[in-house]
Amino acid sequence: PTQVYGGKCYQMEFLGDVNYPPDTVVKPGETFTKQWRVRNTGTCTWTTDFDVIFVWGDKIGGNGDITKDVKPGEEAILSVPIVAPQTAGTYMGYWMVTDNQGARFGYGTNGDYSLAIKIQVAK
């Protein structure tokens, strides 16, 4: 059964990392697409004018698009382009979804948890 947290229009459940789980080691300058699997647990459909936007942390990636409508209860893969820094180290970045009015939402009871990536750039 789909978990609904209080009948909010826009909210999601985080189902997992599709690729590049936390602490994945990447090469300096490597480019890739980070993907997360989520479920729309809200009461409203996400449309193609929604975006996946960078909100804080290390700015190692760009924004992504919602590429098809996601109805309540449906799963979706959210993607953003990443470019690993040239300098070795640990980098973390955080993204949320924005609706067509620019309002942000994430996952969790209050919708305030961000989708995250944590990479280790090799020396």
Each language-model region and where it sits:
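Intrinsically disordered, low-complexity Ser/Thr/Pro-rich tracts
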Residues: 1-123
